[in-house]
Swiss-Prot record:
SUPFAM superfamilies: Purine and uridine phosphorylases (SSF53167)
Source species of the chain: Latilactobacillus sakei subsp. sakei (strain 23K)
Protein name according to UniProt: Purine nucleoside phosphorylase DeoD-type
Self-association state and partner proteins as the record states: Homohexamer; trimer of homodimers.
Catalytically driven reaction(s): a purine D-ribonucleoside + phosphate = a purine nucleobase + alpha-D-ribose 1-phosphate; a purine 2'-deoxy-D-ribonucleoside + phosphate = a purine nucleobase + 2-deoxy-alpha-D-ribose 1-phosphate
Similarity comment: Belongs to the PNP/UDP phosphorylase family.
An individual GO BP term: purine nucleoside catabolic process
Assigned keywords, A-Z: Glycosyltransferase, Transferase
Its job: Catalyzes the reversible phosphorolytic breakdown of the N-glycosidic bond in the beta-(deoxy)ribonucleoside molecules, with the formation of the corresponding free purine bases and pentose-1-phosphate.
Length: 234
């Protein structure tokens, strides 16, 4: 048992999907997994373990933002021996070549968070990147399922409401979308020598204003979940 997760040793699989929303965690477990049991209710950050195609998979809600996902990633890795962490969540789209409901695989995650400087000190700008093997498995799974995906750099922001960032410059430099967690997940995975990936769905377009409903964000986006699950099994 850790500070924020009440599971016992052996309750959590080596592969964990990390949705931010606890209701999305519940939806994933009930819709995609078999023989499911819930191992965590602390702070209503629901955690479940079940089976997908015969292999144990866990789903742990991780909250919103870098501080929250950092807590769960640290505890899953250090207390429960998790080896593969796959964030599944939403992302705001940027540019004209990405659209609402597109699936996106984050190859790398730039950030405006101070987590990089706090870790490495001033003057060193570490580049958080996904695990290549997980990324390739996710991309190949999407191709086999005929799911169109975008692969590229995203931005992990510290603020959801942020008017100061130059969005057009991000688009110019090929940043596909914006969310709030992946950079920390990738950095922590590198620190502890485990695998991490973010598979995202564009829930809204930051430039055009198009968006999906809260219910759709909670209970759909099944293509993203399928890609993540396929990447997570051996």
């Amino acid at each position: 048992m850790s500070t924020h997760i009440e599971a016992q040793q052996g309750d959590i699989a080596e592969t964990v999907l990390l949705p931010g929303d606890p209701l999305r965690a519940k939806y994933i477990a009930e819709t995609f997994l078999t023989d499911v049991h819930r191992y965590n209710t602390i702070r209503n950050a629901f955690g479940y373990t079940g089976y997908y195609k015969g292999q144990a998979i866990s789903v742990q809600a991780s909250g919103m933002g870098i501080p929250s996902i950092s807590i769960y990633a640290n505890e899953l890795i250090q207390f429960y021996g998790v080896k593969r962490l796959i964030r599944v969540g939403t992302c705001g789209g940027l540019g004209t070549d990405v659209h609402v409901r597109d699936v996106m695989i984050a190859q790398s995650a730039s950030t405006d968070s101070a987590i990089i400087q706090n870790t490495f000190g001033a003057g060193l700008y570490y580049a958080p990147t996904a695990d290549f093997k997980l990324l390739m498995k996710a991309y190949q799974a999407a191709q086999q399922a005929q799911i169109a995906v975008k692969v590229g750099n995203i931005l992990s922001e510290d603020r959801f409401y942020n008017d100061e960032i130059d969005r057009q410059k991000l688009i110019q430099y090929g940043v596909l979308g914006s969310e709030m967690e992946a950079a920390a997940l990738y950095m922590l995975a590198a620190k502890f020598n485990v695998q991490a990936l973010a598979v995202l769905t564009i829930s809204n377009h930051i430039i055009t204003g198009e968006e999906t409903s809260a219910e759709e964000r909670e209970k759909s986006f099944n293509e993203m979940i399928t890609v993540a699950l396929e990447a997570g099994i051996a």
